Amino acid sequence: MKNKNKRLLVMAGGTGGHVFPGLAVAKQLQSEGWEIRWLGTEDRMEADLVPKHGIEIDFIKVKGLRGQGLKKLLIAPFQIIGAILQAKKHIQAWQPDVVLGMGGYVSGPGGIAAWLSGIPVVLHEQNAVAGLTNQWLSKIAKRVFQAFPGAFPNADVVGNPVREDVCQLPHPSERFAERNGPIRVLIMGGSQGARILNATLPEVLPKLNHSVEIWHQAGKGNQETVNNAYKDNGITDAKVTEFIDDVAAAYAWADVLVCRSGALTVSEVSAAGVGSVFIPFMHKDRQQALNADHLVQCGAAKMIEQQDLTVQSLVDTLNGLERPKLLEMACNARNAAIIDADVRVATAIKSLAK
């Protein structure tokens, strides 16, 4: 007898960029009475993270093909077939109404297994350049969504799910209303830190033609080194931390953010309403540069690609950003934000459930 509650199987793994948006959609549907289960891999972050959110997870064995040697490539077809069969077994045992693919290696076999089982597949691509798995699955999916324009020619642009505390920040015009004094520069390099930001910013900020307050999130194990770099350049009052526990508070504090342009960061910055200088991670398909491009085009951000980054290029960029300009950029960022991605994807999933 079929369970009266609708069921969603989420396929996402490998990185937070895939897992966190999947959790956001899952939570939205859970609040509407849906049952949620997850398909992932045992050796990646979803194995620990997903159960902490009260969601049961099944595992399949699958790895990426890029960078593999000839021997592994030769046996890869057999491994993929095996992963599809594993996924199909889990799917037929639980019988979801819809399967949601958020990217990562696990989505490929899982999506094919769902299709073979006659279960509708919904895709969400977080980046401006579609991952290989989502490129394949887009041909069999019932609905395809993208966070930024350009990943797919005809997919609906719905943004990325953004945490609620960021979406609820006051409008930039309110935050800037009583603000004066030094420009507040927030540097964020992610949990591991961004080596190029840690090396460059302590040299850049003393050369600016206006005074600044600095909050530099340096990443695990980098706090002392970065702090010393600021001191070596004559800055003794920089706030250097390994992590930022309350990201929303950091966005609210900042006049300008200097950071990479991963998909979720770009979406958060837009929702928060903060003017940014993006230094995209170098990748052959320019994924991070393309993530940032729509905010650059709408006047919400500046971008310096890593191959063009020098101390002087960043000095010149930041020197042109006085507070009135930063308020304008922040308002443009907020105006460009899409903050209901989880609701939009959840609505599509509900429409496909029989």
Curated annotation (Swiss-Prot):
Top-level class of the enzyme under EC nomenclature: transferase
Catalytic activity: di-trans,octa-cis-undecaprenyl diphospho-N-acetyl-alpha-D-muramoyl-L-alanyl-D-glutamyl-meso-2,6-diaminopimeloyl-D-alanyl-D-alanine + UDP-N-acetyl-alpha-D-glucosamine = di-trans,octa-cis-undecaprenyl diphospho-[N-acetyl-alpha-D-glucosaminyl-(1->4)]-N-acetyl-alpha-D-muramoyl-L-alanyl-D-glutamyl-meso-2,6-diaminopimeloyl-D-alanyl-D-alanine + UDP + H(+)
UniProt keyword terms in alphabetical order: Cell cycle, Cell division, Cell inner membrane, Cell membrane, Cell shape, Cell wall biogenesis/degradation, Glycosyltransferase, Membrane, Peptidoglycan synthesis, Transferase
Highest taxon, organism lineage: Bacteria
GO terms assigned for molecular function: UDP-N-acetyl-D-glucosamine:N-acetylmuramoyl-L-alanyl-D-glutamyl-meso-2,6-diaminopimelyl-D-alanyl-D-alanine-diphosphoundecaprenol 4-beta-N-acetylglucosaminlytransferase activity; undecaprenyldiphospho-muramoylpentapeptide beta-N-acetylglucosaminyltransferase activity
Membrane topology: Peripheral membrane protein
Cell compartment(s), UniProt: Cell inner membrane
Pathway stated in the Swiss-Prot or TrEMBL entry: Cell wall biogenesis; peptidoglycan biosynthesis
Main location: membrane
Binding-site list for UDP-N-acetyl-alpha-D-glucosamine: T15, G16, G17, N127, R163, S191, I244, A263, L264, T265, V266, S267, E268, Q288
GO biological process, one term: carbohydrate metabolic process
GO CC entries: plasma membrane
CDD domains: GT28_MurG
InterPro entries: GlcNAc_MurG, Glyco_trans_28_C, GlycoTrans_28_N
Gene3D superfamilies associated with the record: Glycogen Phosphorylase B (3.40.50.2000)
A UniProt-annotated Pfam family: Glyco_transf_28
Record-listed E.C. numbers: 2.4.1.227
Stated role: Cell wall formation. Catalyzes the transfer of a GlcNAc subunit on undecaprenyl-pyrophosphoryl-MurNAc-pentapeptide (lipid intermediate I) to form undecaprenyl-pyrophosphoryl-MurNAc-(pentapeptide)GlcNAc (lipid intermediate II).
Family statement: Belongs to the glycosyltransferase 28 family. MurG subfamily.
Protein name: UDP-N-acetylglucosamine--N-acetylmuramyl-(pentapeptide) pyrophosphoryl-undecaprenol N-acetylglucosamine transferase
Source taxonomy: Bacteria, Pseudomonadati, Pseudomonadota, Gammaproteobacteria, Vibrionales
Gene giving rise to this polypeptide: murG
